[in-house]
Amino acid sequence: DIDLMMPRADYEAFKRVFPQALGEKYVLQAPNTPGCEISNTFMKIILRGTERLELQKLNAPGAHGLWLDVFPIDNAPASAAARAVRGFFIDALNYLAVSNCLRTFDSAALREYVSVNPAAKRNYRLRMALGALTAFLPYRALYNLFDRAAQMKKNTGWITVPTGIRHYAGEAHRASAYFPPSEWKFEGEMVL
């Protein structure tokens, strides 16, 4: 599992060129992408002909191989208060969307896994309840809604990775911390 990040404009452009450029060797799974299966609130690139299962998605449709996770870098409000408010709603929508998906593809293996840890079991029960409350919507619709809601057109000089491990507000930084990219050497080649 390798994680990458892309500015939103590049992320959207990559989704458009992917089928022709890489579609024979890889499978693309991404929200708001016609013809794609969706497995997360972010993009996955899966190597065709490989098999690797995620415990939370044993029953999910689509490819289950070795993958790269690609997280969009989105603009964020300049105001800390606005980032906190926006972050709360974006994170809540993400939690609801993932809960809906977990309930949709629930499995005995996942239930057994969480049963040994009281905190994990409580979180699982909460996610199943929230998944039931949102069951009238397909998980794909919630993933697409989250992806659209996380995008912010206005460039404020602040960015975030809404699907990052520290969530929306925790991943917020001044854009100058990431951009412009710097060149470095990888396996003997200079890359950005």
Which sequence ranges carry the predicted segments?
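Alpha-helical protein-protein interaction elements
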Residues: D3, R86-I90, P138, S176-Y178
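A contiguous, mid-domain pocket- or channel-lining segment that forms the substrate-recognition surface
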Residues: F88-V98
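Catalytic metal-binding acidic patch
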Residues: D1-A13, G188
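A short secondary-structure junction signal
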Residues: A80-V85
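Conserved catalytic core of two-metal-ion nucleotidyltransferases
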Residues: E12, F18-A78, V98-L192
